[in-house]
């Protein structure tokens, strides 16, 4: 099979039994199972959740998004070989480490295939929980233009690009478009402060105001666990985004859990430690791909200016990127995944066929 065949680019057309619409995100698709199938799997697989918990099959793709657009490569390459399996493997590793360190659970109940999670339905917190240990990216761009207050936090004078911050900072933004919150524009990814969340905690999905402290603790503790593990591999954990939600436990109590993915090259910046000590930035995350795009296209403002989205979408749609650029991203993702997990990342020749076979034979979910 060709390289393009080994890439799972379309992941919302699997014949999984469902009575709801398939939710397709930038990278993952979610298939909500029927109530009967959810109850059957909870019973037969022994999942530690209430018997009426809705379950979903979450299938990751190899698509690559940047600047809110999906990009593709030459030769019909619609994604990055190994990217989906690498992201899931990294998240699986960190979630296991979180459990070993006594942190919160995740939404994952089962891992049938490197591309597939079986997850429990959660009530999401509508906050992108962002943690920063170094000043770079959007924080540096704002700081270099003279801004000193970021998400309600006053930054000191004299900071330099890419330097370590005096302390770990929590700089949240909105998840999705939220309306009717005083002082918060109805736009996606708007920076917010802790005081914004406290004053409107229910609008952001928190059940109790005290849970704001818990979310910040889980964010910082999770960051520190990953940062320490990466430091042992001579990698620098620069910044990251976590997501949280509530589930109901066996006793009927709400509990806050980690959702989505954690500590991956898609949701984080990770730098090579040796290069950083030499004053260079060597990205082991999607940031390297973003920088490639900014240098590849003659007018980078199209990628940065939100007022030019139609041009940006056309740019992504009409331009196949060089194969070597796509393969460099593949090497970045699989390389950091193998460092983190200590295991090779599987690259199935036909992932879609493999997924269907497993979900049919071991879970009876294929129609």
Curated annotation (Swiss-Prot):
Pathway: Purine metabolism; IMP biosynthesis via de novo pathway; 5-amino-1-(5-phospho-D-ribosyl)imidazole-4-carboxamide from 5-amino-1-(5-phospho-D-ribosyl)imidazole-4-carboxylate: step 1/2. Keywords: ATP-binding, Ligase, Nucleotide-binding, Purine biosynthesis. InterPro entries: SAICAR_synt/ADE2_N, SAICAR_synthase_Vibrio-typ, SAICAR_synthetase_CS. GO terms for biological process: 'de novo' IMP biosynthetic process. GO terms for molecular function: ATP binding; phosphoribosylaminoimidazolesuccinocarboxamide synthase activity. Transmembrane segments: none annotated. Its EC number is 6.3.2.6. Belongs to the SAICAR synthetase family. HAMAP family: SAICAR_synth. This is Phosphoribosylaminoimidazole-succinocarboxamide synthase. The gene is purC.
């Amino acid at each position: 099979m060709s390289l393009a065949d080994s890439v799972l680019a379309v992941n919302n057309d699997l014949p999984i039994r469902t009575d709801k619409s398939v939710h397709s995100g930038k990278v993952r698709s979610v298939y909500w199972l029927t109530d009967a199938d959810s109850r059957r799997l909870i019973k037969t697989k022994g999942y530690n959740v209430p018997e009426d918990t809705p379950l979903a099959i979450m299938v990751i793709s190899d698509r690559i998004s940047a600047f809110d657009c999906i990009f593709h490569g030459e030769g019909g390459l619609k994604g990055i070989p190994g990217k989906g399996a690498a992201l899931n493997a990294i998240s699986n590793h960190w979630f296991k480490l979180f459990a070993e360190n006594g942190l919160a659970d995740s939404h994952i109940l089962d891992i049938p295939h490197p591309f597939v999670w079986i997850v429990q339905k959660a009530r999401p917190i509508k906050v992108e929980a962002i943690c920063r240990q170094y000043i770079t990216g959007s924080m540096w761009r704002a700081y270099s233009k003279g801004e000193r207050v970021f998400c309600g936090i006053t930054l000191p004078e004299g900071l330099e690009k890419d330097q370590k911050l005096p302390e770990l900072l929590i700089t949240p933004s909105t998840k999705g478009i939220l309306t009717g919150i005083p002082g918060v524009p109805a736009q996606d990814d708007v920076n917010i402060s802790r005081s914004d969340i406290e004053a409107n905690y229910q609008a952001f999905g928190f059940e109790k105001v005290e849970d704001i402290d818990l979310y910040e603790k889980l964010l910082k503790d999770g960051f520190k666990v990953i940062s320490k593990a990466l430091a042992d591999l001579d990698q620098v954990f620069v910044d990251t985004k976590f997501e949280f939600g509530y589930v109901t436990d066996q006793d009927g109590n709400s509990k806050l859990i980690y959702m989505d993915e954690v500590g991956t090259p898609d949701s984080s910046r990770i730098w090579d430690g040796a290069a950083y000590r030499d004053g260079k930035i060597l990205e082991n995350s999607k940031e390297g791909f973003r920088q490639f795009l900014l240098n590849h296209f003659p007018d980078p403002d199209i990628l940065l200016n939100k007022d030019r989205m139609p041009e940006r979408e056309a740019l992504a749609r009409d331009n196949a990127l060089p194969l070597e650029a796509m393969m460099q991203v593949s090497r970045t993702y699989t390389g950091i995944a193998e460092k983190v997990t200590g295991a090779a990342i599987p690259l199935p020749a036909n992932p879609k066929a493999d997924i269907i076979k497993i979900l049919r034979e071991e879970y009876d979910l294929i129609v």
